[in-house]
């Protein structure tokens, strides 16, 4: 728990979560109350515990690697929560946008090769999780066999994202 705010932020992976937790704890006005990491597909098993938290959770924001697995996990989580009347799950769009900008800053505007070779062939329904403004760009990255990991987010990136949340 980092504040009394009613929003919950979930990262797919541990390293970006730990960096974000550090940034949020140092903030005088964190935009989210709780932060966690889902450990990939494990998030689907643990999300139901949100209902047991003392303070109510208004919204869950999810950010994962911009690859097919990361978006699939988010879309399945959103669907599961909607079907079971749990907190609403939204994309952490400001973080996704920053991941795209970070990849560009690092000289890889289309990301890096995805060794899993998973493309958007898994179904366009998965992309409905993403905000329309970035959906096509991310789909193009996937279709080219590339990905952008959460680990592109730096401490200063996160400070900027959280201050404009």
What do these predicted ranges mean?
Residues 1-59, 69-71, 75-165:
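Nucleic-acid enzyme cleavage-core boundary/entry regions
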Residues 65:
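Catalytic palm subdomain of template-directed nucleic-acid polymerases
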């Amino acid at each position: 728990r980092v504040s009394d705010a009613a929003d919950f932020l979930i990262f797919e992976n541990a390293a970006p979560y730990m960096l974000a937790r550090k940034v949020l704890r140092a903030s005088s006005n964190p935009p989210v109350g709780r932060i966690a990491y889902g450990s990939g597909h494990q998030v689907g098993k643990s999300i139901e515990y949100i209902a047991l938290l003392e303070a109510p959770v208004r919204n869950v924001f999810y950010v994962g690697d911009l690859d097919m697995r990361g978006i699939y996990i988010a879309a399945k989580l959103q669907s599961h929560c909607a079907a079971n009347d749990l907190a609403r799950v939204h994309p952490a769009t400001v973080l996704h946008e920053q991941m795209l900008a970070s990849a560009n800053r690092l000289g890889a505007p289309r990301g890096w090769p995805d060794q899993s070779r998973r493309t958007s062939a898994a179904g366009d329904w998965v992309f409905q999780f993403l905000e329309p403004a970035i959906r096509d760009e991310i789909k193009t990255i996937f279709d080219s066999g590339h990905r952008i990991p959460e680990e592109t987010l730096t401490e200063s990136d996160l400070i900027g994202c959280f201050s404009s949340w």
